Amino acid sequence: MTTKLAQFLGIMLYVLVAGVMWGTWLSLGRTMTRYDAATFLADGKHMIANLAVVMAVLMITACLMGFAMVALLLRSGSRLAAGLALAGLLLMVGVLVVTLAVEVPLDNRIKTWTLATLPADWQGLRERWAIFHTVRTFLSLAAVAAAVAATLVGRSDRTGTEVAHRPALAGDRDTRSIG
């Protein structure tokens, strides 16, 4: 796989993850703490059913592609780009950790609730979900920014100095010395 293809696929996966996070935060996350129990349960159960499997696949695939981006950029000698890609990968891993450590356990509890069986602290748990969703939303956006930045930096020369490259133009001569 070429480095640019890996970067393209990685960015697309990061954007898909961040897009779902951002859309949820923008449309629901900022107001869901004011939902009554019936609305919270109905919306929550629909979202869990629609997103659980899709997001598991997207987040894991995004992290794997992020690892590929870092490895390919390191191999190409672009340390700055690799560092930015690594930052993006670590941010995306942070999204996965928050999801698995906080959000999924809460989702698994919410899936079992009915209006009759809501725990006494359901509002606090709802608020906890919203807070951690905000955290992972902005981690995912930062991951996208880092991955995009990695594609925008120049390729390193052998000394590690970042250099800008322009495409070769017709009529350009190779000025490298022989020997």
Question: Which role does the model predict for each range below?
Answer:
Residues 15, 67, 93, 145-148:
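Hydrophobic residues within the alpha-helical transmembrane core of Major Facilitator Superfamily
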Residues 2-15, 71-94:
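Interfacial segments of alpha-helical transmembrane regions
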Residues 21-24, 66-73, 99, 147-154:
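Structural signal for membrane-spanning alpha-helices in multi-pass inner-membrane proteins
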Residues 157-179:
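Intrinsically disordered terminal tails
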